[in-house]
Amino acid sequence: MQSARMKLGFVAVLALAVSAPAAAAPGDHIRLGDAVVTPAVMTGIEAHSNLYLADGGPQTPEVTAMAWVLKPHLGLELDGRQVKFELGAGYGLKKFIDFYPEDEFFPENADRFSDFDVDLSLAVLPQSRVGFRLEDHLDNEAYAAELPTLEGSTSANVTHTGNDLLAGVQLRPGSALQFEVLGQLGIDLYYVPDSLLTLPGTTAYNGRQQYGPVVTGTWKFLPKTSLVGNFSYNFLRWDNNLIEAIGPDIEGSSIGSYIGKPDADAWRVNAGVTGQFTQKLAASAQIGFGAMTYDEQSVLDDPGVATIVSAVDELNVTGAETFATDTSITDGILVNLQVAYAPVRGHSMTVGYRRDFQDAVFTNYVAFNNVFLRYEGSIQNRLGLGAELSYRIDAFHGEVVRSDQNLTAKISSSYKITQWASAGASGSWLRRACAAADCDEIFYSTQYDDFSGTLGFTFAY
């Protein structure tokens, strides 16, 4: 799939290059006929106060670290009357520096050499009564697990590789009405360091395929305001329905060495209004309902149940919280609200609230409530400013039952030195804390704080 996308981008660039000569100046990008190619690269340093997201206890101390970061990116945009095409591809390298080679910690085991992301968007006949739409996102992302003393020759990163594809037909019976009949396909692969697994073999922890239909409707009853509706049905199928309960031993927990991870079917329906209500005020409000139903038989039929004796002893399909747990009625309530206000040109404030649920990797599902406040500003088109504060509560259900509080605070700034070069700095505070009374006893190790900062330069042709 990745190869096919690369070939498609190459063919598009080649065809445009043949049809028209390239013309560009530094900061003006590369122009090939109607297409614009934008190469860019960011390089800088990044520092963390808690690289491995540890709880800071005697057994798992916080480890500070600094890394060199390199992020090249290539963008391609074609804006035509019959075809609109966008392609963005980026790569991320992160090399940690060990300033204290004599101690017991190895920050180089958190090096990241395989991070990348590709975004593709294609619209065919965007103004016709019948059109076609395709969107695809592919990424590979790693982050450090709680393994500060693992030898540097072995990676301590947990890695997720995912691809989400959405494609289908757009129908426009009138200038104000549009429907979309789409299909979605998602693939997720999860890899963990082999030191976290007790069973010999691969570091592939689990994989998931999800697919199903998506139907949307939009009625533009005012020039900049629309009524919107959405329905989706999703089939979620896991490679392994019996997985190891990786991580530290949790005293007082009823979780054994294995966890049931059942397949599921999920559906959602929501509707609302979105638009620009005044020159300074834009808003979106959608409410709905959904459910996720889990198939416990998929766990009982897993080959591991018959071959691993301890797994058989741990299986239990009775009780309020097991791998047979489906979403509750209250967890099925969906809310998505956003209000954006721009008091003066170049400055905007956005406040939002989202309530939803999603399938989880290590238990059945997580229901979450998230509220955020965001500021974006620009001064004289040279100085860019940003700030964001968000608070999210996660409630996990299944064999693993816990509640987390997630607090994120970010600030950022950038200065445009020339048309093709800019400097940037950012800082963030990431905090996760237990939200249940017994968290300090059972899930203390899931809590952490991490202060991080980045200083770098971006060059764009």
Roles of regions detected by a PLM:
Residues 1-10:
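Bacterial N-terminal signal peptides that target proteins for export
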Residues 2, 17, 26-27:
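Exposed boundary/loop context
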Residues 9-19:
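Bacterial N-terminal signal peptides
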Residues 24-461:
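Gram-negative and organellar
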